Structures are given as C-alpha cells and as structure tokens.
Design a protein with these regions (language model features):
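Flavin (primarily FAD) cofactor-binding/catalytic cores of flavoenzymes
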Residues: 1-37, 84-196, 200-208, 214-390
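Nucleotide/phosphate-binding site architecture used for ATP/NTP-dependent chemistry
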Residues: 48-55, 61-69
Length: 390
C-alpha cells in the first residue's frame, strides 16, 4: 500500500515535489495516477497548441518548493536569465518553465511513481482507499489527493455542438485532442473567443496564414496583467474570504475575482499592431446559430442576421464550470456523505481535507483556497496546506 495516491496533472506534480523535498517521501511510497503517458504532457500539448511564449504568472510560481528555484535554474540554463523572463514581473518563458519542470521530474524521480490510467471508482478501506482504474488495475493508499483539473471539460456552446453534429470537421475546440494540423484544414479561419487563448491562437495563425484569420469576440478586450488581483495571493483579500462563512457568498467572491476572458497588455499591443495592417483581423459578434453549405460555414446572431463566414471555426471558449471528475466522484460523495456546497464543490478543512485521508487541490479546493486555486500559485498554496496536516 502506498502512503500517498495523487490523482491529477500539474497540481499533483506540485504536491509530489513538495512531498519528496519537505517530507522525504520516497518515489515508491507515492502513486501518481494520470491518463497520459508522461508527466505534464497535457499541459505541454495545450500550451504548445497556442504557441504561448511566456506564462502569465511571475517567476516565483512554479512546481518547486523554493520560490527562487526557477530564477536560479534560468541563470544556469542555456537560455540565460535575460532571455528567460518578460516584463517587470519576470514572467518565465514557456521553454524555461518546461525545462525546469523536466529537471524536477528527473531530480525527484517522478516517473518511478507514475501510473498511467483513468480512475473508474474509489472505495474506502479500513485504513485507506482503493482506486479502481478503467484498465482493471487496483491502486491502494493511506492518503488520496484529488488534484484533477477541468482540462477535459471543454466548453462547446450549443450552436457549436449542433454545427459539429451536422457538419463534422467544420469546427474544433483549440484544446481538442483531435485538433488537426492547421495547414490541413480549410482556410479562412475564425477563432471564437476574446481571452488570452483566443488572442494567442489568432496571432499564431495570422503569422501562418496572413489575411485569412479573424478573431470573433462578443465583448471588448479586457486588459489585465493577471487573471485575478495579486491581492488574492496574500491576506489583502484572503482574510475576508476566509472570514466569510457562507459558501454561496464565497462562490460569488470567486466569480467576481476572476478576470475571465482577459488578455495581457503586451498581447493587446501585439494584436493592435497587426490590426493597423489587417483591419479585418478582429470582428465583433455573438454567435447563436451556424450552418455549413457548399464548404462555407455561416455564423448568425440571435436575430438570425449573418455575422461572418469562414472555412474552419476554432473555439477558444475555455472550460465548463461544473465539478471535475463528477462521474466517479458522485458515488463516493453520496456513500461517505462528503460535504459539498450548493454549487456542488467540496467543503473542506483549512488543510484541504475532505474526508479521512482524502484531500483536494485545484478546482476542487477553490471554496477554501479562493480564485487562485486553479493556478500554479494555488497549487503551491494547496501543497503547503496539505503538508501542514502531516
């Protein structure tokens, strides 16, 4: 039996690093369950799909325990410190961040703990938990940490679902595993969205296919350096959040704090620079219906008026807000009467304990950690709290 079973990707990797370095947990004492063959492969796939050059978070947010670990790694790397960070907040390049992650994977022997598989069910034992995987394997451990994200819950608006049903291959989600190569898709391209993912993808495709790309957004660009106020990283906002006993109110605070669909200043500047030469690169419109005839996809608003026509539509519409892993979480919530708020998310202790030997991170922890829960900063906070309970 393992001491720790961690279910999840980048959040779980953060906890694994903290357990190895701060608690001396050996690789064979941990089991990291993930559907993918390699650590962080899904994170890499998504960030590479949009050619993200720099992370949105500052240099102290990464998977290692020491906040300055990434900075030291940059000084010792081939990239050099000057080319590795952007702006006054020293946001790390994606290449540096990936290299640092791989360094930690090797250094902490994470692959020795890696188990590729999908969770089918979880059962409580007298002294721990038993995880059933879809491939028939069983994994048992004293403590289980649910660090699952929302990465497999892609948001497809109703009109997009209908278009995909009626005309397969005419529309994709940018984070779809089946996303084809762009040069094999029909131009022109229309990106649906208005946030950082949409703008990064627009700039990427515009470079490949100049004059054949349009970003279709339904709201003005919301320009912010970060996806929530930095005050949420400390007591400035966290104190009031934790003093709030109502979980309905906490959910309202989380929704209000998130700068959903926002972009950074340098992306806004880069897009506006291209707009001077290509004024049709960005258009406004809220799609309610779509159809495809004779190889052309037509997009319509709620009044049925034509907004735009395209060859291939690509959604950059984010993820669905419901509870991650609900299909296999629902039975254990009911069986063990695990506390949940009205929104369906876990109600946990300060150390993120949901039940005996059962802990949460990421989206599942946001009613306790706050709006940063889904970010790398939230992963570090969650890992620190879980270790406090040991």
């Amino acid at each position: 039996m393992h001491n720790w079973i961690i279910i999840g990707g980048i959040q779980g990797m953060t906890l694994a690093t903290f357990l190895r370095k701060q608690k001396g947990v050996a690789p064979e004492e941990m089991a990291i369950i993930d559907p993918h063959e390699e650590p962080l492969s899904e994170w890499r796939r998504c960030t590479e799909a949009i050619s993200m050059p720099f992370l949105r978070s500052p240099f102290v947010h990464h998977l290692d325990v020491d906040p300055f670990s990434l900075n030291r790694h940059a000084k010792a790397s081939l990239f050099g410190e000057g080319a590795s960070f952007f702006g006054k907040f020293k946001r790390p390049s994606l290449l540096l961040f990936h290299e640092h992650c791989e360094h930690l994977v090797r250094e902490q022997e994470i692959r020795r703990s890696w188990i590729q598989g999908r969770v089918e069910s979880i059962k409580r034992l007298e002294n721990g938990w038993k995880i059933h995987l879809e491939n028939g394997s069983l994994v048992m451990g004293a403590n289980v940490v649910l660090a699952i994200g929302a990465g497999e819950q892609l948001h497809w608006p109703e009109w997009a679902q209908q278009l995909q049903t009626d005309s397969p291959g005419s529309i994709f989600h940018v984070f779809d595993k089946e996303l084809p190569k762009f040069d094999a898709s029909q131009a022109p391209f229309t990106i649906i969205g208005g946030g950082i993912t949409a703008v990064l993808l627009t700039l990427k495709l515009h470079k490949q296919f100049p004059g054949q790309v349009t970003l279709l957004k339904r709201h003005p660009f919301r320009v912010h350096d970060f996806d929530s106020d930095p005050g949420w990283l400390g007591p400035k906002y966290q104190q009031a959040f934790h003093n709030t006993r109502s979980y309905v109110r906490r959910r309202e605070m989380i929704v209000a704090a998130r700068r959903k669909g926002s972009i950074t200043r340098e992306l806004n500047a880069a897009l506006r620079k291209q707009l001077r030469q290509f004024p049709r690169l960005v258009a406004d419109g809220h799609v309610h219906k779509a159809n495809r005839q004779k190889g052309i996809t037509s997009l319509f608003d709620e009044d049925g008026s034509l907004i735009h026509q395209t060859g291939t539509a690509i959604l950059a519409t984010g993820f669905q807000p419901q509870l991650p892993g609900s299909s296999w979480l629902a039975p254990i919530i009911e069986e063990h009467r695990l506390p949940c708020a009205a929104c369906g998310y876990p109600v946990v202790t300060h150390t993120l304990q949901w039940g005996p030997g059962l802990y949460v991170m990421g989206p599942l922890a946001e009613l306790e950690v706050g709006p940063i829960a889904r970010n790398i900063s939230g992963a570090r906070e969650a890992a620190s709290r879980i270790l406090q309970a040991q």
